[in-house]
Amino acid sequence: MLGRKIAGTCLRANVPSVAATSSTPATQTRNSHTIWYPDAKFERQFKTGGTLGKLWMSERVSDFDEKIGLDKLEKLAYSDPVMSDNYSGKQREKNLENMILNFGPQHPAAHGVLRLVLKLEGEVIIKAIPHIGLLHRATEKLIEHKTYTQALPYFDRLDYVSMMCNEQAWSLAVEKLLGIDIPTRAKYIRTLMGELTRIQNHIMGITTHALDVGAMTPFFWMFEEREKLFEFSERVSGARMHANYVRPGGVAWDLPIGLMDDIYDWAIKFPERIDELEDMLTENRIWKARTIDIGLVSAADALNWGFSGVMVRGSGIKQDVRKTEPYDAYADMEFDVPIGTKGDCYDRYLCRIEEMRQSLNIVHQCLNKMPAGEIKVDDHKVVPPKRAEMKENMESLIHHFKFFTEGFQVPPGATYVPIEAPKGEFGVYLVADGTGKPYRCFIRAPGFAHLAAIHDVCYMSLIADIVAVIGTMDIVFGEVDR
């Protein structure tokens, strides 16, 4: 108040002349241009005061106050307080504008065409909205206009990191509707190639996850091994990636001579590569800081969100289609299903590492137990005849022509066949109407359910952690958008 009085005595002499010369009306609109009033920063210094009136309004109105308009300001302050809800000392929070950030689709960590709209409060994510459909190619609709054989290559292009596993799901669904059982050798070949594909996928998943959070070396070291797996795929099918190898009724070709020996030589050396990968990451304090307690998913949430694969096993649930509903040769295989305890990114990383070791175990069993025999069913309505037979037998030529022009008829019915793809439960729901083309094909992609829950997994995480979460989900947009 002392400062107030001094200011008053200094200004008193000038007030009449100002009032006389000014053409401003007596009632002033209170705004930032006419009269000063406390802002949030000023009020924070006097938090105990709580209201504008308590801060700087005098108890009685003096003639000086009336002359410079402070009495009117006082009434305004009490009728419309600036920063207070009441006069109990509670302050009204200042409204903060949250930042809306587009993450992707051209972000290097977006794993393809992922677009996330992030709502940020500082660096904390309070909302994450995935925008899908940028890689939509109407696969399910196209399959309705193709024969059962022509539909197969579309599955290579869904999850384009684990191709032969997708083919397996389609072939098993068609075989189930046809009611056929394929030869044992074909089952073992499918299982062998499926596990090599699983290792190929996990190499990609783990190393790109590490690359996203800043570790480049694992990516370059492990891709040499992935290249060797591509070579095996090329030797067995002629194509490095989109193999079109696992077909309804068996597999397209038998294993070439020498391939099993080469796979064995690779399989006994590969554990050393896994050890090198673990040396770089598992006890690395930076890697642990970026993955432990990040992307936590409880067991109940994992089930409620429809998670599968590593995403559900990392939370401690022992769920694996190869164990619960064995297909092909998995009933004859002995292997363990690794599970996590906490459900964070680090647990899921350890699960993938151990899954690669278990896949190698299955590969060795397939190589040791591989039976001799046929690789396709002996039914030329489902499987085309050999070229040698076509040149000698008229019926074989007719079967060949009918197979590649009209395809084979599947009895009416519907089925759902799940398999344990590297990313989770990949399922095919197939409806047949008795013609040579499917009536409806629905593809259950594991990544779709994982991406749908990204808001809940990332809520209140830092923006840097969303990169780690996307990496641990191992999302590929071919299967999400379809």
From Swiss-Prot:
Molecular function terms, GO-annotated: 4 iron, 4 sulfur cluster binding; metal ion binding; NAD binding; NADH dehydrogenase (ubiquinone) activity; quinone binding
Protein EC: 7.1.1.2
InterPro entries reported in the protein's UniProt record: NADH_Q_OxRdtase_suD (IPR001135), NADH_UbQ_OxRdtase_49kDa_CS (IPR014029), NDH1_su_D/H (IPR022885), NiFe-Hase_large (IPR029014)
First-tier enzyme category under EC: translocase
Binding residues for [4Fe-4S] cluster: C345, C351, C366
Matches recorded under SUPFAM superfamilies: HydB/Nqo4-like
Gene3D superfamilies in UniProt: Cytochrome-c3 Hydrogenase, chain B
Recorded topology in the membrane: Peripheral membrane protein
Cofactor(s) listed in the protein's UniProt record: [4Fe-4S] cluster
Main location: mitochondrion
Keywords associated with the record: 4Fe-4S, Electron transport, Iron, Iron-sulfur, Membrane, Metal-binding, Mitochondrion, Mitochondrion inner membrane, NAD, Oxidoreductase, Respiratory chain, Transit peptide, Translocase, Transport, Ubiquinone
Cofactor note: Binds 1 [4Fe-4S] cluster.
GO cellular component: intracellular membrane-bounded organelle; mitochondrial inner membrane; respiratory chain complex I
GO biological process, one term: response to xenobiotic stimulus
Keyword Ribosomal protein in annotation: no
Catalytic activity: a ubiquinone + NADH + 5 H(+)(in) = a ubiquinol + NAD(+) + 4 H(+)(out)
Location(s) in or outside the cell: Mitochondrion inner membrane
A Pfam family hit: Complex1_49kDa
Protein's job: Core subunit of the mitochondrial membrane respiratory chain NADH dehydrogenase (Complex I) that is believed to belong to the minimal assembly required for catalysis. Complex I functions in the transfer of electrons from NADH to the respiratory chain. The immediate electron acceptor for the enzyme is believed to be ubiquinone.
Subunit structure of this chain's protein: Complex I is composed of 45 different subunits. Component of the iron-sulfur (IP) fragment of the enzyme.
Similarity-based family: Belongs to the complex I 49 kDa subunit family.
Name of this chain's protein: Probable NADH dehydrogenase [ubiquinone] iron-sulfur protein 2, mitochondrial
Organism: Caenorhabditis elegans
